[in-house]
């Protein structure tokens, strides 16, 4: 394990029952809890919380300040940007048509989860899709296509049922966040914050919208 450190933050820490393989990189302040496994080649940013019984595969990239709750497996090809929340037992895949007796490692498809996104408990993210920044995937949803930034997704298969603010609040018809007062507007390419009273979170760029379009 390579554990980055800084003068004002504690070094990364792993519970004695966790296994962090040599060649995995953990950022300063990151904590890995009981019975979790971080494979060689995984890169985890600073100040992350990795819950119990989490499996992080080789080549997985996790940004800073992410929270991975219990019983989550992240496979090769998964990238989580900064501030992503993965709820308990949410599921990622990396092959669309797996067979036990056929090697399909060459067919792994990547999954990218954008800045600040939330994935609810027991949700499934089918590989090859991108989740936009600050989106919210409801518990138990099954995501089978790209998700726009700030979208609220629910159901099987998941569909957009509304919008959420950067603070994670469901937006009503007025598109005003009830927690922060931030105001949003629908544009042809998605939702945009037009009044930022809270100062929380980065606004969505045209490039971010296009990347999941």
What kind of feature is each model-predicted range?
Residues 133-136, 142, 178:
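Internal alpha/beta core interface subdomains
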Residues 132-135, 148-150:
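Conserved catalytic segment of ABC-fold P-loop ATPases
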Residues 160, 169-172, 183-186:
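Cys/His-rich microdomains that often coordinate metals
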Residues 165, 177-180:
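Short cysteine-rich clusters marking metal-coordination/redox-active sites
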Residues 3-16, 21-26, 31-131, 162, ...:
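Flexible, glycine/small-residue-enriched loop-and-beta-strand segment within the central core
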Residues 181-213:
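Short microdomains enriched in Cys/His and/or Lys/Arg
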Residues 120, 126, 138, 143-144:
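Short hydrophobic beta-strand segments in globular cytosolic domains
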